Structures are given as C-alpha cells and as structure tokens.
C-alpha cells in the first residue's frame, strides 16, 4: 500500500463512469490557462500538517464525486474544431494533489516572515505551484491541479481550476465546495453532495444556441481579429506548439513597445489594503451630487485606481483623448434565461468602460468621472452584444479568432479591472487543523508594459479588501507619493 505522502493520485469518492462532456461555446471562448490560488495557514508540527494533507485529499475525493467533470481531460470535441471542446473522463481517472516539504529550503521565507512582510510571493511560483500549472494548457490537460507545501511554521496550498471549465464565479464556488468537504472530513461527517443540482447539458446547449447576427457588424473597440494560434483562447495540440506561439506573440509585443519608445521591464505587483471605513469614505467621495447617478463601492474602487494612474501619466497631451477599462461581468442572472449560480462553466461577458482623459486626469473630476463610467458600462451591458462576441468567434475562419487588441493592451492609459471580492476564499474554513486561511494570493503574470491591471482580492471577515496592482515601477512609485490615493489605501507588500 503506497504512503499517502508518495501517492498523490486522488480518485472520486464514488465511481464516475467513463464519458465525454461537450463544453459550451463560452467555455471554448475562455482563456486557456489555469489561474493558481495560494492559501496560507500557520501550522505547528509536521503531524498536524500531514493530518491536514489527509483531510484535503479526502475532501478532494468527495469534491470529484460531487463535480465529476473535474476529473477529466481537455480535448477537442467531436467536430475536431478547436472552437468546440470537450472533457474526456476515463473509468480510472484521478487528480493529483502533490505534497512537498520545502521547510528546509532557505530560499523560501518562513510563515512568520511572510506574515511580517505582507505575504509576498517573490520567487514562489516554480517551487510551490503544481507541476501541471507551470506549462501551457493544451490538449490532454487536466481540469484542475493542486499541491500542498510545508514551509517553516506553516503550509501553502496552491491549486487551480481550468478557466475552460470555470470562470471566476465558478472557480470560487469550487473552492468553497472543496473547503466544505475537507471540513466535513475533519469533523467525521459522512459524504453528502454539497453542490446544488443543475441541468448542465441543458445549460451548455442554451449557452451554445446563438441567434443569427450580422457578420459585418462592428466589433467592440477593445477586440481585434487575430491569428488563432497567437490568441489567449486557442487550444494548442501540444506544449511545443503552445510555447512557440507564446514566444512569437511576446516578441511581437516587445517590438511594438520598443517602436513606441517604451523600455520593457519586469512588471511590479503591489498590494494595497482598504478598510471598511476607508471604503465608505471612498464611495462618498466618488458619488455625484445627482441622486440618479448611484455607484457601487466597486465602481468607486476601480475609479480610484483608474483616475490616479491616468493623472500620474498625463497621456492626454500625447494625442490620446480617452481611456478604456476592461472588466468581466458575471451574467448568470442577467441573461433572458438565467443560469443557476451553482452551474460550473463560463457565463461571463467582457465589458469596457470609456472615460475622456481630460476628465479622468482632473483632480476635481477624475474619481467621480471614472466611477460613473464604470457604473454606466455595467448598466449598459446587453445580451445581444455578448451574443455578437461569441457569434463572431464561431463564424471566423479556423485560423482567426477574437482577442483583446494589442493596441489596448499596450497603451499605458488603459486598465484591466477584476473583482473577486465576493469569492469566499478568505472566509471559508477547511476544517481542523488548518481552519480559515490567514491570507490568499493569486499567481498571475503581468505585461512588460502597457495597460495596468487591478485585481480586487476576496473580502476579509472584517470587510476589508486587498487590491493587487500590476504596473511599471514609475507608476507604483508615484502612487506611494500620491496624497489622494493614500487617503484611502494602506500599503501591504510589493514584489516583481
């Protein structure tokens, strides 16, 4: 009988029959990557760590029985078309939950040092990540991967679900379910399905049945037709092909930056914390005196980063008249035929907010203008616009697809915004001995230049939010010195 610390394979708690699950059109349009979450816990003694690992394995086994598609592998569908994808599940399928003791590695900070420094992830990626997550997603890739790491005084769980299977909301729900199953294992509670039943096949057909559209209709300005093999949503046959395409796309991006006079640099990642009191003050400052122009706290938060970064850069004098902020909307409840929140799949729509740069850069108008632009973009979403995006992808020749335009990505006055505040990673308990994570992080790459990226992390139990910014060193330095920004934000940590 193999040791639990050498046998990483986890099989479903109940038998899962061999099957092929055809995915939806929105799944096929999703980026082909596996975002990795990091969960940190303090752990005393290796015996507690091993007990926690056993609970995670048993909890994962129950999760796989609860959501069988997680045990499958990504393939092209029956049509052999890279835009029609499927998950193949074999009768002996399993998922790896790796384990590694890196507590003796002097290059890895101790848990106490991580706490003291705000939980930076410098130098972590290649060491703590599951092996499967370090390469590109290709045909045959698993639907999830996970690894538990023992460090000095603590543990780090690194896991991810394929974006082809799970958008942001579904990713959060899967993490919550795994935590719940692990907690039940630690409490000696027998297996019970925790995922609400959903008619998945019916929902996928619904999401893939798109109305006729005008093939010549103009595209959203932040999209462009691009060679399929260079796009983020293309499924390559193997790692070699994927790496070759990635290298080509990166070389093209670098050449464009250099031609524009930019000096490519390693992106910097900075975390800022906003307390409930500061969030309330920020929303008040971003709210217009016009009662009809209500905004959310998230509109205000996006508006703060968007307006201050624009003011720092002063790009309007260089010929740009407006700025765009791209974000993703979960549209499960906004579709004419709503999709249950428990559905695991992609039901998101890319949206762009637009704001004149002369307003955005204004000390008196910038915050309110940016927040209101975010609100109007949210309110202005329509189902036909989302359907046109998917229809265009499916109607193009096989060697073409839609992707975010390089022009958008490489213009410094634009911004990406991602709201994960509703995720429950910081509040879910994984049972004894781990319990509730002390902190969560997400491993992402950043551009060597161009648009800044803002990620709002899962909310803390006290209502605080951490926000992660990826941008150039010059922007980060200017934000440290920006009185308006620092009125609301508290620095946590920074790394490259």
Swiss-Prot record:
Keywords: Acyltransferase, Transferase. The keyword Transferase applies. PANTHER family: FATTY ALCOHOL:CAFFEOYL-COA ACYLTRANSFERASE (PTHR31642:SF310), TRICHOTHECENE 3-O-ACETYLTRANSFERASE (PTHR31642). GO terms for molecular function: acyltransferase activity, transferring groups other than amino-acyl groups. Pathway: Secondary metabolite biosynthesis. Acyltransferase; part of the gene cluster that mediates the biosynthesis of squalestatin S1 (SQS1, also known as zaragozic acid A), a heavily oxidized fungal polyketide that offers potent cholesterol lowering activity by targeting squalene synthase (SS). SQS1 is composed of a 2,8-dioxobicyclic[3.2.1]octane-3,4,5-tricarboxyclic acid core that is connected to two lipophilic polyketide arms. The gene is M4. Belongs to the plant acyltransferase family. The active site is at residue 163. Monomer. Its EC number is 2.3.1.-. This is Acyltransferase M4. The lineage of its organism: Eukaryota, Fungi, Dikarya, Ascomycota, Pezizomycotina. It comes from the Eukaryota. InterPro entries: CAT-like_dom_sf, Plant_Fungal_Acyltransferase. Signal peptide: none annotated.
């Amino acid at each position: 009988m193999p040791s639990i610390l050498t046998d990483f394979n986890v099989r479903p708690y109940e038998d899962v029959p061999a099957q092929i699950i055809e995915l939806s059109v929105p799944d096929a349009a999703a980026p082909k990557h596996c975002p990795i979450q990091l969960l940190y816990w303090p752990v005393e003694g290796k015996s507690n760590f091993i007990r926690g690992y056993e609970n995670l394995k048993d909890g994962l086994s129950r999760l796989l029985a609860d959501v069988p598609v997680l045990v499958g592998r990504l393939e092209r569908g029956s049509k052999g078309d890279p835009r029609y994808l499927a998950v193949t599940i074999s009768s002996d399928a399993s998922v790896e939950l790796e384990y590694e003791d890196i507590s003796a590695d002097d290059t890895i900070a101790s848990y106490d040092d991580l706490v003291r420094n705000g939980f930076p992830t410098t130098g972590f990626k290649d060491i703590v990540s599951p092996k499967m997550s370090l390469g590109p997603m290709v045909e045959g890739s698993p639907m999830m991967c996970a690894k538990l790491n023992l460090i000095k005084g603590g543990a780090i769980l690194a896991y991810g679900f394929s974006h082809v299977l799970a958008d942001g909301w579904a990713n959060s729900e899967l993490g919550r379910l795994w935590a719940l199953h692990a907690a039940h294992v630690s409490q000696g509670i027998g297996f019970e399905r925790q995922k609400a039943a959903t008619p998945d096949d019916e929902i996928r057909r619904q999401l893939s049945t798109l109305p006729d559209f005008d093939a010549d209709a103009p595209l959203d300005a932040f999209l462009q037709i691009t060679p399929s093999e260079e796009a983020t949503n293309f499924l390559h046959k193997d790692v070699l092909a994927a790496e070759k395409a990635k290298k080509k796309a990166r070389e093209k991006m670098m050449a464009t930056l250099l031609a524009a006079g930019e000096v490519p640099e390693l992106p910097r990642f900075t975390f800022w914390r906003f307390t409930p009191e500061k969030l309330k003050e920020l929303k008040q400052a971003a709210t217009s005196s016009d009662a009809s122009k209500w905004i959310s706290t998230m509109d205000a938060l996006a508006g703060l980063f968007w307006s201050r970064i624009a003011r720092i850069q002063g790009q309007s004098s260089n010929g740009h008249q407006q700025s765009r902020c791209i974000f993703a909307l979960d549209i499960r409840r906004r579709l004419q035929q709503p999709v249950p929140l428990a559905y695991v799949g992609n039901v998101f729509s890319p949206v762009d907010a637009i704001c004149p740069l002369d307003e955005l850069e204004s000390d008196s108008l910038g915050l309110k203008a940016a927040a209101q632009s975010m609100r109007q973009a949210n309110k202005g979403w329509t189902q036909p616009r989302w359907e046109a995006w998917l229809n265009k992808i499916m109607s193009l020749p096989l060697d073409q697809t839609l992707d975010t335009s390089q022009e958008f990505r490489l213009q410094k006055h634009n911004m990406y915004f991602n709201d994960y505040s509703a995720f429950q990673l910081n509040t879910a308990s994984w049972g004894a001995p781990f319990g509730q994570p002390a902190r969560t992080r997400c491993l992402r790459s950043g551009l060597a230049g161009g648009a800044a990226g803002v990620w709002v992390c899962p909310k803390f139990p006290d209502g605080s939010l951490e926000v992660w910014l990826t941008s150039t060193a010059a922007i980060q330095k200017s934000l440290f010195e920006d009185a308006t920004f620092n009125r609301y934000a508290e620095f946590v940590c920074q790394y490259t």
